[in-house]
Regions:
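N-terminal export signals
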Residues: 1-17
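Bacterial signal peptide processing site
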Residues: 19-21
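Extracytoplasmic small-molecule ligand-binding "clamshell" domains
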Residues: 25-94, 102, 164, 228
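Periplasmic-binding protein-like
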Residues: 36-37, 112-119, 195-234, 252-264
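Ligand-binding cleft/hinge of the Venus flytrap
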Residues: 44-46, 58-67, 144-166, 194-198
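Extended ligand-binding regions for polar small-molecule ligands
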Residues: 55-64, 122-125, 129-143, 215-254
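A conserved helix-loop-strand patch within extracytoplasmic ligand-binding domains
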Residues: 67, 75, 108-158, 220-222
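A ligand-binding cleft/hinge motif common to bilobed small-molecule-binding domains
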Residues: 78-81, 94-103, 147-150, 174-210
Length: 264
């Protein structure tokens, strides 16, 4: 196994083990949160500890509910099977609610997110209509993949070639290396990658989708955690906790809390 693969494997195990230890040390009942790495929402900091917007929000919200959050890295494509089987209690990681309302029990929305297309800074692509005959990389089972493959958005040419990637971080590298013409993902994730890697992509002005982010529980989960968490998140929004947490990672934090404007 090469150095890069070893580092990736170590990061996965660290995310799990650190989260498990902290949850056990708290003495509280554990809630297992399933996600994959997606800065700035969930990732390992320089000390190898899970951190990010969703980690901080989840930790505080579940603490108020009397639980300790334990974070498990998951194969994102298997998220529904994992939550339905009870291997994890919920899916939390910049997860769009739009179009999935009937698939899970939801808590939220707690944040607003824009799904966008990014291209090379010097690309001639200026709008979604310019994607005709171009190749766009998306994460498999993600919302952008659904939007592009469904053919339901009249702004998107039917001749776009869609490349579905399991690991979302590979998307960014493919665009940076010129292997694809564009990528589609959450705007905040793209901005974080640009910041971390000193790369200049250009984000198209018209978004694919403006959506609410939520926390997904299994449809057969009758514990009431979804409604309790929704109430707790509303309290955290009202007392300023959400804005303070988001503000540690993103500028203009208040704009991400305008959940009442979704669909307006």
């Amino acid at each position: 196994m090469g150095c890069a693969r070893l580092a990736a494997a170590a990061a996965v195990s660290s995310l799990t083990s650190c989260g498990e230890k902290e949850a056990k040390d708290s003495g509280l009942a554990q809630i297992v949160v399933g996600s994959d790495s997606y800065p700035p929402y969930i990732y390992l900091n320089n000390d190898g500890v899970p951190t990010g917007i969703d980690v901080e929000i989840a930790t505080e919200a579940f603490r108020r509910m009397g639980y300790a959050a334990r974070f498990e890295t998951i194969n994102w494509e298997q998220k529904t099977n994992l939550v339905e089987s009870g291997a994890i209690d919920c899916i939390w990681g910049c997860f769009s609610m739009d179009g999935r309302e009937e698939v899970y029990r939801w808590a939220g929305p707690y944040m607003v997110s824009r799904q966008v297309v990014a291209v090379d800074a010097h690309s001639s692509i200026r709008s979604l209509s310019d994607l005709a005959g171009k190749t766009v990389a998306v994460q498999s089972t993600g919302k952008p993949e659904e939007i592009f493959l469904s053919g339901s958005d009249p702004r998107i040419p039917q001749t776009v070639e869609v490349l579905s990637i399991e690991n979302r971080s590979v998307q960014y590298a493919m665009l940076a290396c010129g292997y694809v013409d564009g990528i589609a993902a959450h705007e905040t994730g793209i901005l974080q990658y640009m910041k971390d890697n000193a790369i200049d992509f250009r984000i198209l002005e018209e978004p694919l989708l403006v959506t609410g982010l939520g926390i997904a529980f299994a449809k057969n989960d009758t514990r009431g955690l979804d409604s309790q968490l929704t109430d707790t998140l509303a309290q955290m929004r009202a007392d300023g906790t959400l804005e303070r947490i988001i503000g540690r990672y993103l500028e203009n934090a208040s704009q991400y809390l305008e959940v009442d404007t979704i669909g307006a």
